[in-house]
Each structure stands twice: as structure tokens, then as C-alpha cells.
Amino acid sequence: MAPSRKFFVGGNWKMNGRKKCLGELICTLNAAKLPADTEVVCAPPSAYIDFARQKLDPKIAVAAQNCYKVTNGAFTGEISPGMIKDLGAEWVVLGHSERRHVFGESDELIGQKVAHALAEGLGVIACIGEKLDEREAGITEKVVFEQTKVIADNVKDWSKVVLAYEPVWAIGTGKTATPQQAQEVHEKLRGWLKCNVSDEVAQSTRIIYGGSVTGATCKELASQPDVDGFLVGGASLKPEFVDIINAKQ
């Protein structure tokens, strides 16, 4: 990892937790020794964004797990970047595979959300990744490059973007891409950014890995030159999240 790219660890709590157990998790995180050279972000369910922001140590940022593409309006059930910022959160996760595949979000919609979130001043954790049948068909690059292009077309300032590569076949399945598989895709993504955006953006943009990251798998993954951190699912609700945050130490 280039010295200019600060290691980034996001915890995606998904639709999990209640005040009591999330409060206990937050106490664990607040009491833990976290490295100063690692950026840590937690993404609680939207109902708990305010709770998390009030309880978490200020050095841990808060993200929403989703947002809509406009500021206000008759969009029942949606939240806007402005609302997310109003609660003190600084980031939003967009394009997560569960949004794509469970809720049917298209590349086009994700691109529109990315553009609006950035315009409103949020940082964006933009997710891309192939499904198992796509990997087995040998089209991993085609899929992730197409997804990345739609994101890139909607980004003016890359300093507020973290790219999260999550092979869909490794999310919540217990299967993890090998460190070599992760590095190979991350390296190709950086190459795509160099060719299609700029060398400066390619060198400075953090590309993080998501997909069944655990305390046991994180150190070797973190040692790969193009893996700049993690987007952690289930393990971010457990004390081992602290070990993952410390993967570079």
C-alpha cells in the first residue's frame, strides 16, 4: 500500500442489532486501542445513525448504508444525504451487492446516488464485485470494470471516494477470496483507474476488500500492496472487529 493511502476499515452492521447490544459494541470500540494511521467508519442501520454518532468516540466516523438520489420529496422509506449529514454522519455505503441483488438497484441508479451524495458533501464507499457464476465464466474483470465505469462517470472529486471490491460469492458465505485473488483484482482496478481517470487518482484512491473478512484472514489480506483496508460485515458486530482494524499493526 502506498504511504499516501491511509488504511481504511469500515464496519457494515447491515440490518442487525438493537440499542443494548450496539451500545455494548460501541463501548468495546471506544475502549479499544485503535491505530492513529487507520481510518475507521461504522455503518449502523439508519434508525441508529444518531445513536451511534452520539455514543461512538469522535475519532470513529459514522456512515449510512444507503441513500437516495435527491434531496427531499415523496419517496417513502428513503433517506437523503442531507439527512445523513444532519445526524453527524460523514459517509454512505452505495452499490452494496445486497442493494444490487436483493433490492434490484441498477448501475444507473447507483451512479446517480453516488453523484448526489458527493455533491451533498458525503464521502462514498462505492461497492463493486462479481457473482460466483461470473467469476466461473471468467468475466470478473468485465463485470467490475463496467460497475466501476458507472461510478467513475459520476465522480468529480475522488478524494471523497473509497472503492470497495466485494466478490459477491464471498459475502456472508464464509468463503474469502485468497489474498492473491484479492490483490489481482485490486491491482487491475488500479490499472483501470490509471487508464480511464488518471495516474494520480489511481495512486491515491483507496481500494478496500469486502467478503467474509475475519480476525483470522485480515493480516495476510492487509499485507497485499493494493489492498488498502476492508469493508467488514458480520465480524464488525463482534469484538474481533478490533483485530481487523489493527490488521496493519
From Swiss-Prot:
Its main location: cytoplasm. One of its GO terms (cellular component) is cytosol. Pfam families: TIM. GO terms for biological process: gluconeogenesis; glyceraldehyde-3-phosphate biosynthetic process; glycerol catabolic process; glycolytic process; methylglyoxal biosynthetic process. There is a cross-link at K142 (Glycyl lysine isopeptide (Lys-Gly) (interchain with G-Cter in SUMO1)). GO terms for molecular function: methylglyoxal synthase activity; protein homodimerization activity; triose-phosphate isomerase activity. Keywords: Acetylation, Cytoplasm, Gluconeogenesis, Glycolysis, Isomerase, Isopeptide bond, Lyase, Methylation, Nitration, Phosphoprotein, Ubl conjugation. The active site is at E166 (proton acceptor). It is found in: Cytoplasm. SUPFAM superfamilies: Triosephosphate isomerase (TIM). Substrate binds at N12, K14. Pathway: Carbohydrate biosynthesis; gluconeogenesis; Carbohydrate degradation; glycolysis; D-glyceraldehyde 3-phosphate from glycerone phosphate: step 1/1. The modification N6-methyllysine is found at K194. InterPro entries: Aldolase_TIM, TIM_sf, TrioseP_Isoase_bac/euk, Triosephosphate_isomerase, Triosephosphate_isomerase_AS. The modification Phosphothreonine is found at T173, T214. Its EC number is 5.3.1.1, 4.2.3.3. It catalyses: D-glyceraldehyde 3-phosphate = dihydroxyacetone phosphate; dihydroxyacetone phosphate = methylglyoxal + phosphate. The modification N6-acetyllysine is found at K14, K156, K194, K238. Triosephosphate isomerase is an extremely efficient metabolic enzyme that catalyzes the interconversion between dihydroxyacetone phosphate (DHAP) and D-glyceraldehyde-3-phosphate (G3P) in glycolysis and gluconeogenesis. It is also responsible for the non-negligible production of methylglyoxal a reactive cytotoxic side-product that modifies and can alter proteins, DNA and lipids. Belongs to the triosephosphate isomerase family. Homodimer. This is Triosephosphate isomerase. The lineage of its organism: Eukaryota, Metazoa, Chordata, Craniata, Vertebrata. The gene is TPI1.
